A protein has these predicted regions:
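Ligand-binding pockets and gating/stacking loops
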Residues: 2-488
Length: 488
């Protein structure tokens, strides 16, 4: 062990243990000195969260009574002005987050598609055959992958380019079914559907315990908490006179977070060598909590700056409870059923946001403030099974680049509809994704990977069913940011 671990730790952000074991820790600016710490830039993070089967309009969108016109075809209302729950889906669990979230309406996918699990981060339909047959999107790039490969986002290679989580329960004789990936990247003419992780224990071992799942650590090491494996280095750093009070608290909170997470995983029976607890493996709520805690820890300590989380389940017992079939129905009963099922998903999202907002970073902002979390869906209105009027919730301001605490409606004036008298049209959904990437510090040169400007699929421009000019007014606006959301 070195006599000056704090000098090395400040630069590399690792604690060392026996056998070369290394544990990443959060950035601790007090070890760098005031001048260097003041010059250190805050890293932005991006998280994409996805759910299925669309939303009923009556459930998702807030009351916009009293909304102000803030730009052409753009209305906005403060979320703090809404009495009671924001909506039937965005309920009391978001009350403490009202000034940190943004709800968007009037963003339309310009793609011909039904169920499309890759849409939220590609703005593209799948080629013939559908996703179930493994076909790629027409535009085979997802935002998370673009960020992972962007030099302006990762100036130096990260420990992990992105943490992609698709939690699945251990059913079917204890076997873990493979999760679904909605992330894509194309390089040298080869399109790849990027892998996801579905087992929290495997992710923990790979990222925090330093072992590959195929080999696994020694059984004694599997029972030992990772913090205990670096105890000497941890204690020396924690008691260092150079470590400031806020950084000491930050380090202790991080250690407590990992201890609690690893203890819960051990109780499930997979971190130790005992058999899994069947009741736990059917508890979707606990499963998502473990994956959320993994993601938050990885973002907080700089292991990665990009994450995705697929929330498939709608009940704690893991049953789907007719989630898909109900999306094809209409009327008050179907709306109530959908609200009840989506409440489970919304609570998981609120848990993620609340935990990110509880971590105070060296610049005084929270991890959530310095991030952009995008909760999207594969569909708009589930009944129509299309991508018009996508239900979108954003959280975090990406270090002040995006406006929060508001609901924004981008729908056009009356008469600009899908078919005569149909749904009012808004702006291209792809404008949200380019705004998100700009908020992460990218230039259009890094996301324009197709044949022209913009991002995603623009099949419906000029469509005969798009009345009143449809989206044609935005045909030349593919590099523009979403008004009122974008603060620069």
């Amino acid at each position: 062990m070195t006599d000056r671990p704090e000098r090395r730790l400040a630069r590399r952000a690792f604690l060392r243990g026996a056998g070369g074991f290394a544990l990443a820790i959060p950035f601790l600016p007090s070890l760098l000195g005031s001048r260097v710490a003041a010059d250190a830039s805050t890293s932005r993070r991006f998280v994409g969260v996805f759910s299925l089967n669309g939303q009923f309009e009556a459930n998702w969108h807030p009351d916009m009574t009293g909304a102000a016109t803030v730009a052409p075809n753009t209305l906005a209302r403060s979320l703090t002005d809404i009495d009671g729950p924001i909506s039937n889906i965005i309920g009391p669990q978001f009350d403490g987050l009202r000034d940190k979230i943004t709800l968007l309406r009037g963003l339309d996918g310009l793609t011909e598609s039904g169920h499309n699990r890759s849409f939220p981060l590609t703005a593209s339909a799948h080629t013939e055959g559908g996703m179930e047959r493994g076909s790629a999107p027409f535009f085979p790039y997802s935002v998370d992958a673009v960020l992972e490969h962007a030099p302006s986002f990762y100036a130096t290679p990260p420990v992990l380019g992105a943490m992609r989580l698709s939690p699945m329960l251990r059913r079917y004789n204890g076997e873990l079914r493979a999760g679904e990936s909605f992330s894509w990247w194309t390089e040298d003419g080869v399109t790849t559907r990027l892998p996801v992780q579905s087992d929290a224990e495997v992710v923990f071992r790979q990222v925090f315990a330093g072992s590959e799942p195929s080999e696994g650590p020694d059984p004694n090491e599997r029972r030992q908490l990772v913090i205990d494996r670096v105890k000497e280095d941890f204690d020396r750093l924690r008691t260092s006179p150079r470590l400031g009070g806020q950084d000491r608290e930050r380090l202790s909170n991080y250690a407590d977070h990992l201890r609690d997470l690893q203890t819960r995983l051990a109780a499930a029976g997979s971190v130790t060598c005992t058999g899994p607890d069947v009741a736990y493996l059917e508890d979707a709520e606990a499963m998502y909590t473990n994956h959320i805690d993994l993601l938050v820890a990885a973002l907080a300590c700089g292991i990665t700056r990009v994450g995705t989380l697929f929330i498939k389940h709608v009940r704690a017992d893991g049953e789907m409870a007719g989630f898909h079939s109900n999306s094809h129905l209409s009327g008050p009963e179907a709306e109530r059923t959908s609200a009840g099922l989506n409440a489970f998903i919304a609570t998981r999202v609120a848990e993620l946001l609340t935990k990110m907002d509880a971590i105070v970073e060296p610049d005084g902002n929270t991890l959530l403030d310095n991030s952009l979390v995008l909760w999207g869906n594969e569909l708009g209105d589930g009944g129509s099974h299309g991508q018009l009027d996508m239900p979108m919730l954003l959280a975090g301001s990406a270090c002040g680049r995006l406006r929060t605490g508001v609901a924004i409606d981008y729908r056009s004036e009356e008469g600009v509809t899908w078919t005569n008298g149909g749904k009012r049209l808004g702006r291209p959904y792809s404008m949200l994704l380019t705004t998100a990437m700009a908020a992460m510090g990218l230039s259009h040169h890094e996301w324009e990977l197709g044949d022209g400007p913009g991002f995603g699929d623009y099949q419906k421009l000029g469509h005969r069913y798009a009345k009143g000019g449809g989206w044609d007014r935005y045909a030349d606006a593919r590099r523009e940011m979403l008004p009122h959301l974008w603060m620069g």
